[in-house]
Amino acid sequence: MLKVKKVVDSLREIVFGLEDGMVSTLGAITGIGIASDNHYVIILSGLVIISVESVSMAVGAYLANRSVIEVEKKEVRQEKKEVANQPKEERQELEDIYRQQGWPAALAIDMARVASENPKLFLEEMVTHELRLPVRPKDHSILSAFFMFCSYILGGLIPLLPYFFWSNAPARLLSIIVTMLGLFILGSWTTRITGQRWWKVGMRMVLLGGVAIVIGWLVGRLSPLAIG
C-alpha cells in the first residue's frame, strides 16, 4: 500500500511538472511571439520562464511535501500521547474500529485487548486504522522537488525547441502541434495507472493546452494596444 502511495505521489509530481511546463511555456511564448516577433526575445523569454518556473515549482513541491510530513508526524505524536495517557479510551476506539471493519464483536474485543498489551503494536494499530497514516512517515520532499524540477524543464522545452530551428511563423505552428501531441501522449500515458479512457484524458490535456494558446494569443494581440 505504501509502495503504491509512493508511486502515485511521484506520478503526481511528474505529470504536474510536464503538463505545467508545456502549457505555461506554450502560452507565454505564443503571446510574446505575437506581440514582439523578435526571435531572440522569444527564445530568451522561454528560457527565463523555464528556468525560473522550474525552480519555483520544485521549491513549492518541497515545501508542500514537508508540510504534509510535519502534519503527519504531529498526528502520530499526538496519538502516541493518547495511547499512553488514555489506554482504556483508545482501546475502546480500536474495538469500535474493528467492529466497523466487520470483525465479530467478541473477536474485536480480543484483538483490541491483545494489541493494547503491546505499546508498539497498540500505537501502530491506532495510527494505521484511526489516522490512516504510516507510523513513521517517509520524507520524499527532496525526491518530489527533483521530479518536479526535471519534469517542468522537460515539459517547457517541448514548445520552445522549434524556435531553435525555424523562424517565428513556422516555429509557432510546430510549437503548438508538438505541444498538443505531447499533452495528448501525457494524458494517455497516465491512464495506464488510473484506468481511465486514454483518449478522454488525452483530449482533456489538449483542451488545457488550447486554453493556454488562446490566452497567450489574446494577450499578445491586446498588449501592444494597451501599452502603446
Q: Where would I find each of the regions flagged by the language model?
A:
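Cytosol/matrix-facing amphipathic helices and coiled-coil assembly/linker segments
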Residues: M1-K6, R66-M148
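Juxtamembrane boundary at the C-terminal end of a transmembrane helix
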Residues: W217-G228
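Alpha-helical transmembrane segments of multipass membrane proteins
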Residues: V52, S56, G155, P159, ...
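Internal alpha-helical transmembrane segments
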Residues: M1-R66
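Structural signature of hydrophobic alpha-helical transmembrane segments
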Residues: A169-L181
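Residue-level signature of catalytic and energy-coupling elements of molecular machines
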Residues: D20, V59, A108, Y152, ...
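Transmembrane alpha-helical segments and their cytosolic interface motifs
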Residues: S10-A28, V135-L161
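Interfacial loop-to-transmembrane junctions
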Residues: I185-G210
